[in-house]
Amino acid sequence: MQDAWVEQMEQTLNPMSVPMDNPIGTIESKDRQAILAALLVHLWHGYRKMRDCLMELEDAMLQGNREQARSLLLQIKRFCGTSFRYEEDAVLPALDHHIGSEQLHELTAAHDLVIRHVRRLEGLLSTSPGGEEQIEQGRMLIHALLMQVACTAGLTLLIETLPQDALIRILQARERALVEGKDLYEWDKDIRG
């Protein structure tokens, strides 16, 4: 059973680069289980992609491959921009009754921390190689980002409990965020203000 799930996950299109097939026009006709399954597959792929990019970024930094590290950081910024957009627009408001406003505030503050960590990583990659200390600083930031991915992925346990209309709103918000394609800084400046 687990192998079938992994196989299905591997065969699904990468949600980082391909929006879903017009979910806004047809999703209402599907049952809750189908909607939930589609949402969880897309969320899971996104979190896996982010995890993989962060782990590859750490490897690139350890190998001194700054060009690859900068390329991976661009992917991370794009993922975070779209992901944080639909999380703050639809996921977090839908979970308010489960976790309360204080936890919602902490999750939103975690997005601010991610922005600071990504900026620090960019700073490390924009300067001349600084040796072991610079690499260790980068690794600490990457590890903190990996923990944030793991914590956010855990929200899927609560998303599973949401009613169909909330699931549809999350899928629609996700689709809009992917179509807009704002990176982390654009989202923070243009959308959050």
Question: Which residues does each predicted region cover?
Answer:
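Small-residue-biased structural context
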Residues: 1-193
